[in-house]
């Protein structure tokens, strides 16, 4: 059980600051807990894919934490995990249908990794460790902070891989945000041949390793 699950039922500024800092940096689900690595490594070959999956996971975390916290006193302890999974699966289905309806190209690009959010340890972990033990407002904000932390990690890794692999940034972002976003695409440099390693799975592992190393260096300097 992490220290967030023991927060008092208060709403002081320090509580919100702690929740936010834990979710985004200190206890980042991707860079500290190393959870949800399968979708992180698989779809982070571009900012568009990374942002799409990050927003979907953020939405699922907020909704599942909200429902679990609302009904935490009514859910029988013995069958709480199957109930949490059902709640998460329902939320993921809603996200999947919305993406299929409004961002179909991105939906096709992300493929199986949208329904796989159901099995993401981040989501079920926050429901069990935090939402089931804390009031609604704290649970919702915890879902937001944890989801934001994962989303930022995804986008940062996706940006690195897209820049190195294709020389672009925000390529295909119109599939997520609409036609108006076509102007956001940036071609940083022209590549006669793509640096395939960056956009293939080995590049994802190398990129994640570099990000983890940078974070550890920053944390060590802050402690000094």
Swiss-Prot record:
It comes from the Bacteria. InterPro entries: NqrDE/RnfAE, RnfE. Part of a membrane-bound complex that couples electron transfer with translocation of ions across the membrane. The chain crosses the membrane at residues 51-71, 81-101, 105-125, 140-160, 194-214. The keyword rRNA processing does not apply. One of its GO terms (biological process) is electron transport chain. Belongs to the NqrDE/RnfAE family. GO terms for cellular component: plasma membrane. This is Ion-translocating oxidoreductase complex subunit E. Keywords: Cell inner membrane, Cell membrane, Electron transport, Membrane, Translocase, Transmembrane, Transmembrane helix, Transport. Its EC number is 7.-.-.-. It is a multi-pass membrane protein. Signal peptide: none annotated. Coiled coil: none annotated. Its main location: membrane. The keyword Transmembrane helix applies. It is found in: Cell inner membrane. The complex is composed of six subunits: RnfA, RnfB, RnfC, RnfD, RnfE and RnfG.
